[in-house]
């Protein structure tokens, strides 16, 4: 009340005025904060777009262009090895491979390929990964031991992955009328997985159909195999040119003799030489896709993320190829002189990898 002598009335009026002004100021700030929030969200979205564009720019940058070229060329070379038998195998060679002399020639190539695979694993891939693991570990011996155990686990993972691929794509769809061949000559043609020709009792048409299916299944397995090779080649070039070149050379040493066997299987399935060559050439697409997949999924943290798992994983895959697909064919040799020649060729393959390591940087 005006003119009220009570001091409490003046204090209450001042408090009411203060609260009113404070409420008006808060409402004004709340109304003005919405544009600020909208601008903050727009800025965050802009940063995300910039980050995504930077990642794509780094993927297609000039520094990565060299890796793209080397990886695609290496994968293409591995894929084109399927056409190589067309250049060296005469028309009658398909029949010659079924003989004992042809099987022995194939085992000679496989012995050299086995040495190249083992040399690449134990002289290049695993030492490179081991040295990197020991050098970058910041902790004590416990953390270093843990890193080394992870390296061993990646080797086992690579071995089991290749085992699973062979189980799924080679053995799951075998025709019941096709029994495994006991002939070591036939087994040498396709890594121990050549099948005996079914009996002609159901009719010639059924025989031809079964042979065609076996040829197409072999092409499917070859495409999957080339995809894993493309992964290995591209991932190795992401580490260094030296590792990439050595890996490509090791794959070629393994692939060329096996492609001869795959080519013979296609001839046996009823394809002519040119059709078999074109089908083998089409499997090279799997290697290119594998190389692109490996590069596009590369971690932005750099090469160190690749070395940790790619090198031991690839080593496990190569060990599976060498010890499961190649070595059993060589153990079937009974002649001591031929066995000695196989051991010498195996050592020659290892020596080639040693020389490549010394002269290729």
UniProtKB/Swiss-Prot annotation:
Transmembrane segments: 7-27, 69-89, 109-129, 151-171, 233-253, 276-296, 307-327, 340-360
Subcellular localization: Golgi apparatus membrane; Cytoplasmic vesicle membrane; Endoplasmic reticulum membrane
General function of this protein: Functions as a zinc transporter transporting Zn(2+) from the Golgi apparatus to the cytosol and thus influences the zinc level at least in areas of the cytosol. May regulate beige adipocyte differentiation.
Organism the protein comes from: Mus musculus (Mouse)
Phylogenetic placement of the source organism: Eukaryota, Metazoa, Chordata, Craniata, Vertebrata
Family stated for the protein in its record: Belongs to the ZIP transporter (TC 2.A.5) family.
Lumenal topological domain: 1-6, 90-108, 172-232, 297-306, 361
Topological domains annotated Cytoplasmic: 28-68, 130-150, 254-275, 328-339
Subunit composition and interactions: Homodimer.
A GO BP annotation: intracellular zinc ion homeostasis
Listed GO CC annotations: cytoplasmic vesicle membrane; endoplasmic reticulum membrane; Golgi apparatus; Golgi membrane; perinuclear region of cytoplasm
InterPro entries documented for this protein: ZIP
Protein name stated in the entry: Zinc transporter ZIP13
Gene disruption: observed consequences: Homozygous knockout mice for Slc39a13 show growth retardation and results in a generalized skeletal and connective tissue disorder, namely develop progressive kyphosis after 3 or 4 weeks of age.
Molecular-function GO terms, alphabetical: protein homodimerization activity; zinc ion transmembrane transporter activity
Mode of membrane association: Multi-pass membrane protein
Motif (XEXPHE-motif) on chain: 254-259
This protein's record includes keyword Zinc: yes
Keywords, sorted A to Z: Cytoplasmic vesicle, Endoplasmic reticulum, Golgi apparatus, Ion transport, Membrane, Transmembrane, Transmembrane helix, Transport, Zinc, Zinc transport
């Amino acid at each position: 009340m005006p003119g009220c002598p009570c001091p409490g009335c003046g204090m209450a009026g001042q408090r009411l005025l203060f609260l009113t002004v404070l409420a008006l100021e808060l409402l004004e700030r709340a109304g003005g904060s919405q544009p600020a929030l909208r601008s903050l969200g727009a800025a965050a979205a802009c940063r995300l777009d910039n980050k995504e564009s930077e990642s794509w720019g780094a993927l297609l940058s000039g520094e990565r262009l060299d890796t793209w070229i080397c990886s695609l060329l290496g994968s293409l070379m591995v894929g084109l090895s399927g056409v190589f038998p067309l250049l060296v195998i005469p028309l009658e060679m398909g029949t010659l491979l079924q003989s004992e002399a042809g099987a022995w020639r194939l085992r000679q190539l496989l012995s050299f390929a086995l040495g190249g695979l083992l040399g690449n694993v134990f002289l290049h891939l695993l030492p490179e990964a081991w040295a990197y693991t020991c050098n970058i570990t910041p902790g004590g011996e416990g953390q270093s031991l843990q890193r080394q155990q992870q390296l061993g686990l990646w080797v086992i993972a690579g071995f089991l992955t290749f085992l699973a691929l062979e189980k799924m794509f080679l053995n799951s769809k075998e025709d019941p009328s096709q029994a495994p061949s006991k002939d070591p000559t036939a087994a040498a043609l396709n890594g121990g997985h050549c099948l005996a020709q079914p009996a002609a009792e159901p009719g010639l048409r059924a025989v031809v159909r079964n042979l065609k299916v076996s040829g197409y299944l072999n092409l499917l397995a070859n495409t999957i195999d080339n995809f894993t090779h493309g992964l290995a080649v591209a991932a190795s070039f992401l580490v260094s040119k030296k590792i990439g070149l050595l890996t490509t050379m090791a794959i070629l040493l393994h692939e060329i003799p096996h492609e001869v066997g795959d080519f013979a299987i296609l001839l046996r399935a009823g394809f002519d030489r040119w059709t078999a060559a074109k089908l083998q050439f089409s499997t090279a697409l799997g290697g290119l896709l594998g190389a692109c997949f490996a590069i596009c999924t590369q971690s932005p943290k750099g090469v160190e993320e690749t070395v940790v798992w790619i090198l031991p994983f690839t080593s496990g895959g190569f060990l599976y190829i060498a010890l499961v697909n190649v070595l059993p064919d060589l153990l079937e040799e009974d002649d001591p002189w031929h066995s000695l020649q196989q051991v010498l060729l195996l050592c020659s393959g290892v020596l080639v990898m040693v020389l490549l390591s010394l002269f290729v940087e």
